[in-house]
């Protein structure tokens, strides 16, 4: 049973602050973050590779309006260029992952990634160490994090 149920946000913040300052938490944090970043990178790589498995249509664009035709040609070219950048980022992240998962995670992070990282951290702390930890989003419900 979670001993923090029914506590105010201020009490939960104090709990987290105390937890994060504890020697035990400080001792395990590097290992936890290694695992968080490793899992994050693996998840993002899997998502990106699924995206890359979809092919950009190569069939001719049939439209009487030359502006529409040019728009779709440009869109295709942009998608192909983005895919090349995506492939490069994936390869770089794969190279970094065994020795520097934090750098690999930074390379693949985008808007909203903090929520995924926090969820992983929360889960790992709970499952592996039995520690209840609250994310910044949980402790600051009126703040929008990206």
Task: Kindly give the residue locations of the regions a language model identified.
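Short amphipathic alpha-helical heptad-repeat segments
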Residues: 2-12
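Short acidic DE-rich linear segments
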Residues: 144-146
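Charged, low-complexity interaction regions
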Residues: 18-29, 97-99
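Extended, non-membrane alpha-helical segments enriched in charged/polar residues
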Residues: 10, 14-17, 34, 38
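Acidic, low-complexity, intrinsically disordered interaction modules
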Residues: 36-91, 98-128, 132-135
């Amino acid at each position: 049973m979670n001993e923090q149920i029914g506590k105010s946000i201020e009490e939960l913040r104090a709990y987290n602050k105390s937890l994060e300052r504890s020697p035990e938490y400080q001792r395990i944090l590097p290992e936890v973050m290694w695992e968080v970043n490793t899992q994050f990178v693996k998840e993002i790589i899997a998502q990106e590779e699924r995206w890359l498995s979809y092919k950009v249509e190569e069939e001719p664009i049939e439209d009487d309006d030359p502006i529409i035709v040019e728009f779709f040609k440009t869109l295709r070219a942009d998608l192909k260029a983005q895919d090349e950048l995506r492939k490069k980022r994936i390869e770089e992240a794969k190279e970094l992952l065994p020795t520097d998962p934090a750098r690999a995670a930074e390379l693949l992070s985008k808007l909203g990634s903090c929520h995924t990282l926090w969820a992983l951290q929360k889960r790992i702390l709970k499952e592996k160490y039995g520690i209840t930890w609250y994310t910044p989003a949980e402790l600051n419900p009126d703040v929008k994090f990206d």
